[in-house]
Swiss-Prot record:
Entry-linked PROSITE patterns: NAC_AB
Protein name: Transcription factor BTF3 homolog 4
Biased composition (Acidic residues): 134-150
Origin organism lineage: Eukaryota, Metazoa, Chordata, Craniata, Vertebrata
Disordered: region residues: 124-158
Source species, domain of life: Eukaryota
Origin species: Gallus gallus (Chicken)
Name of the coding gene: BTF3L4
Length: 158
């Protein structure tokens, strides 16, 4: 960059005369508790009501993962059509949640579950497939076929 342009930019940032220091950029540090307080105050404006007795909340994403809340705090404002779920969230694959989550799945999730079920046996078979060395050993145990049984059955039918 040109020295003249650089000097102009430096002069714009300077506070006071030539001998004073440049101003420092103020950095605002936000904590999680401050965000929570701001969120709770916004929810109070919406007049949310606590909903008791909810043991778990599962949010199923398009990619097949589930956001799982165990014993969450659920608040709702029906007039604003807003629900707030707070608590410890865990991202889990849908296969880990399967036995208990089937009743919660919708039509879209069931079709994606079918696709996942089709892929699952292939993965299991690929992992359990015998190695080429094992195949050679197994071939020794099976006797060779001496005659063709299909031709013999055709001859009997005639």
């Amino acid at each position: 960059m040109n020295q003249e342009k650089l000097a102009k930019l430096q002069a714009q940032v300077r506070i006071g005369g030539k001998g004073t220091a440049r101003r420092k950029k103020k950095v605002v540090h936000r904590t999680a508790t401050a965000d929570d307080k701001k969120l709770q105050s916004s929810l109070k404006k919406l007049a949310v009501n606590n909903i008791a007795g909810i043991e778990e909340v599962n949010m199923i994403k398009d990619d097949g993962t589930v956001i799982h809340f165990n014993n969450p705090k659920v608040q709702a404002s029906l007039s604003a059509n807003t629900f707030a779920i707070t608590g410890h969230a865990e991202a889990k694959p849908i296969t880990e949640m399967l036995p208990g989550i089937l009743s919660q799945l919708g039509a879209d999730s069931l079709t994606s579950l079918r696709k996942l079920a089709e892929q699952f046996p292939r993965q299991v078979l690929d992992s359990k497939a015998p190695k080429s060395e094992d195949i050679d050993e197994e071939d020794d145990d099976v006797p060779d076929l001496a005659e063709n049984f299909d031709e013999a059955s055709k001859n009997e039918a005639n």
